[in-house]
């Protein structure tokens, strides 16, 4: 993948310090993004949800923000409209909203290309992708979080960059192809890793062992992988080509054929890199 260095942490002089934001969606990302935008000095003028009560509940915690009860025209004017909705909902929402001419509309999806906006030539499309996992009750370190930007033109790009730089020191311009590759990598690093930890927890529970036993190992694994190329510091029976141990492990997984197959496939993947 092509290099994409982080951009300087400053706001372009021609972009207002305080932008007005219209927000569609009230899920985990949206619920954490809205307070961050307010803290950065922006105005979230409205939030919309398919469930009006959800929008009203979120708006009640955001000073100066109202719940938008309907998508009927006219849309309240805003500098940026952010679509914090599931990927599959972006295109239908784009088609359903009566956008003001020239509106800057950005989705927050990692795998959705900028081309999704081609069906709406009256809007200026963009991408405002926060690379992080969001969970209720867990605070986000916004300044350290990568924010990935793409836009259909220089004016839209400048505005989204200004918005991103007001939140994060890790702002990057990525093409749709780069962002898709990043999203795939993030699934391996986050979602698959978490699933493997879940399997490990379940196996320990079956043996009457506490999950805390693995905590030091998990911390060391992650710290080492961040400090060195992960393939270079790979350890374990697959690297050693320890056939008896590999066979014993697969036999121990006989009651879990899906995990047994996963173990064999991961072993093969590790050995293919040797």
Over which residues does each language-model region extend?
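Internal alpha-helical scaffold of NAD(P)-dependent oxidoreductase catalytic cores
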Residues: 54-61, 119-122, 139-226
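Rossmann-like NAD(P)(H) cofactor-binding subdomain of soluble oxidoreductases
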Residues: 48, 52, 56, 60-139
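Interdomain hinge/lid region at the active-site interface
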Residues: 219-274
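Amphipathic, non-transmembrane alpha-helical scaffold segments
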Residues: 48, 186-189, 193, 263, ...
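Phosphate-coordination loops involved in phosphoryl transfer and adenosine-cofactor binding
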Residues: 15-18, 102, 144
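NAD(P)+-binding Rossmann beta1-loop-alpha1 motif at the extreme N-terminus of oxidoreductases
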Residues: 3-70
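Predominantly flavin-linked oxidoreductase catalytic cores and closely associated redox partners
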Residues: 131-139, 153, 206, 231, ...
